[in-house]
From Swiss-Prot:
Protein name in the entry: Chi-conotoxin-like 1
Taxon lineage: Eukaryota, Metazoa, Spiralia, Lophotrochozoa, Mollusca
Residues carrying 4-hydroxyproline: 11
Location of Cysteine amide modifications: 12
PTM info: Contains 2 disulfide bonds.
Keyword Acyltransferase: no
Family: Belongs to the conotoxin T superfamily.
Keywords: Amidation, Disulfide bond, Hydroxylation, Neurotoxin, Oxidation, Secreted, Toxin
Organism in which the protein naturally occurs: Conus textile (Cloth-of-gold cone)
Protein's cellular compartments: Secreted
GO molecular function: toxin activity
GO cellular component: extracellular region
Amino acid sequence: DPCCGYRMCVPC
């Protein structure tokens, strides 16, 4: 699932 505009959840 997209998270913060990326495929993986990363610090914004």
